[in-house]
Structures are given as C-alpha cells and as structure tokens.
Amino acid sequence: MKFYLFSKRCMIKKIFLLLCVLKTYEFMTESERRQIIELIKREVIPAIGCTEPIAVALCVAKAAETLGMRPEKIEVLLSANILKNAMGVGIPGTGMVGLPIAVALGALIGKSEYQLEVLKDCTPEAVECGKQFIAERRICISLKDNITEKLYIEVICRSGDRTAKAVIAGGHTTLIY
C-alpha cells in the first residue's frame, strides 16, 4: 500500500503565508526554519488513502469497537462536503472506489487506534468480506440534515438490540462522540 501525508488546511495556509512573507527557505533565519519544521511536525500525520473516506472508515471502526461485535447494519450520516469528496475516491489495496468499501472495511478490520491508517491491516480476504457486506445491503449512507460543519461524520452501528454511535467533526480525526 502507498502512504500519503495528510495536512490540515490551516497548516498549509500558515506555511504558504510564511513562505510568501519570507520569500524562500534559504533566506530564513534558523529560528524561522525551526518554527516551520515544528509546525509541520505538529500538523502533518500519516494516512493511507484520501482523508475523507479514511476518516469515515475511522469513525465506523470506532463505532464498531464500541458496539463490541460485528455490526449487522451501519448507518452513515455525512456533511455534504464529506459526501461529495469521498464518493468517487479509490480506497488503497481494494481496487474499489467510494464510501461503501471504506465503511465495510472500517467495520470489519478497522482499528481506530491507527487513526488515518485505520485500514492498514487490509488484506484481499478482508476486501472480499467487505464486498459481501456491501452486497448484503448492510450499509446506508446519506446526507445529514441541518449541519453547518463542513467536516461531519456520524456512524450508528447496530447488531441485535445493541447500538453504538461515533461522531467525527471539525477535523479528520476529531472524535467528539
């Protein structure tokens, strides 16, 4: 699998502004260079794949872990921005595109402690199980109404009479519920 770096928009803006003001790295003082390096270390984290579907997989993994068993049904409610940006994106290691496989794998093999590398344990067997999970129509993905957050992911996992919920909002790894 390929590894991608995830960088927050605010961090990119800060670096861009710093570089515009300071012109180039070679004209910076040692202190300014250290500040930029520290900013990058603070704001850049490893991710496998595009951050939107991987953040959804992370939220699903957290809800499934909270449920304590394999979910029978998964409901995913997303902000328009996440839905738009995640639907047509390839999921590394799967040969597939879109949210359904990210959701299925998040539930089946995802580990929330891996953050945006939540699917790093993906195998061909897991992908086949994910395809079956999708074929059984166990996943419902829809737009969350009345959300002002651009980044909002809500997942409800159900199995029998048990229910678990997880919510990410504001940042790709910011679990708020």
Segments predicted by a language model, with ranges:
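Generic N-terminal amphipathic, Lys/Arg-enriched alpha-helix
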Residues: 35-48
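Alpha-helical support elements that line or immediately flank enzyme active sites
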Residues: 53-69
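Signature of multi-pass transmembrane helix bundles
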Residues: 135-177
